[in-house]
Amino acid sequence: MSRKSKASNREVASRPQHSQPPPHERPEPVARALLQGWLSWLVPVVIALITCAAFLPTLQNQFVNLDDNDNFLDNPHYRGLAWTHLRWMWTTHQGHYIPLTWMTLGLDYLLWGMNPVGYHLTSLLLHVTNAVVFFFVVRWLLTRALPSPSERGYALAVSAGVAALVFAIHPLRVESVAWVTERRDVLSGLFYLVTILVYLRACEGEERGRRWYWLAVATFVLALLSKSMVVNLPVVLLILDVYPLRRLGGAIGWWSEPARRIYIEKIPFVLLAAGASAIAVMAQSSVHAAASLAQLSLPGRLVVSAYGLGFYLWKMVVPVNLSPLYELPRTMDPVAPPFILSYALVLAITAIVLALRRPVPGLPAAWVAYVVVLLPVLGILQSGPQIAADRYTYLAGLGWASLAGAGLLSTWRRWPPFVLTGLAVVLLSGLGTLSWNQVEVWHDSEKLWTHALAIDPKTSMAQFGLGRVRADQGKPAEAIEHYRQALNIKPDYGAAHYNWGVVLGQQGKPAEAIEHYRLAVQMRPNSADAHNNWGALLGQQGRLADAIEHFQQALRLKPDFAEAHNNWGFALAQQGKRAEAIEHYRHALRLDPDNALAQSNLLNAIQRRDMGKEDSAQSRKGEKTE
């Protein structure tokens, strides 16, 4: 062998020696496996602890008079899990079909009674669980989306953990977690995330894939029974099929045989979503919650939709001045500055997404998923007084949080890890602090509405809510002033007239109270409460026949209205119709077994009836004696 060939051999042999790190810097395979296994469990624990810490003040919060009073404080139907409670839960009530959510609230009642701490604890634990499940979802997605993820055990775990925390402790999550009424958000979110995780598992292999697939269908059913907003999930799964699963589009195409199989496997999800959507529309119609075209025109709905897309993006980046209610403007000016800025932001994001669709394929996936998830609440089917709501971002924020984790992982080798970790700590500390402060806004009704008015003094519902607080505090003059302010902002605010009437009735001013009830019914013809109270005041004036007409109308509008049955019974008793009165008292108690007034009235009516029978018997006996 020549010297040249020997030298060549030496050069070939020497290359691996210079490319490998020193032995003490090379992690052994066993050590690497132990590190990755340790991180797989440590990171979720850290996520859970940080999320709990950020939302800890919620355990001191009370029920608030933003739907909590109607759903819990004044609603005996959910209090338990007996057959009568379950029958009520599994039928459409109060504008939503959420039987599984009601069952968790019924369990809360059995465990805690009416102590709000238990309700808040359950919501918090569900949210913490969602954060942990989302960590596993993101880790799986990053493993598929980015090259050579197996070499980044620590980086992968940290990036997925940061993504989970960006979702979990963002201030936009506070409304869903700290407001008991929104239990449906955190519960449906749990089954939504579990469905995605199980679906990803089903896509991994053929042997047990079908079992995982049908398990995903089953968990989707549970999500739909918790809140209908999850109907977007079939489309989100298709987006995941495109990226990062790469089961659709690209080399596979859109209409090839493998692609058609992808579409076919979505049929059960689509059918379930369609059924849930139909039930949701019927539920909204039953309480007249949907806005008519006369109330909000089609161009106005398009303006609201564009505004919502821009508004939520802005609040994700700058989560300050968050309010429990962003009220729909009385007049919709499409060229007003807030709307113009929203259009510009949406167009700019769309342009960026199109420009970066090849180098950053996760960006269009996140953008399309964001739009799809928000679509039901973007104003096309407007429901409620709000133009936007923080709670609507609970699922819509998942894609952007995943993208944040992907961005961190993709820059891990280009930036020093301690710099990236430091930036993540600063970001998460800021989000956690803002969330802590926002949770305290939801402590009680007074803080809630005072905060809302500080953000926007022209929010009629906030004036109304604060008026109810003052009425409960025994401050009728201040309550009336807030109702007056609410009506100045929104002259057709029937609920403000109703509550004004309640205060006047308590002040012993029946004529003035009746006038406000009349206006309330004129503005809200479906107000059973206004008819009931109007009838009660007429009964006090001795106009029993007129009073009974209002009780009948109240029960036509609200058949399970125990108080109306009690009042009708009382009017009948005054007319001397004790047998009919007793039947109405009993009906009231079947609807509300704890109704103390109906119990007392029933006992008195039975005693009077029995006394009458005794008097009659004594009278007949006397006649026979004579």
Segment roles from a protein language model:
Residues 2-495, 499, 529, 533:
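Polytopic membrane enzymes that build or remodel cell-surface glycoconjugates and lipids
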Residues 582, 586-587, 594-626:
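Terminal, low-structured helical/coil segments at or just beyond the last alpha-helical repeat
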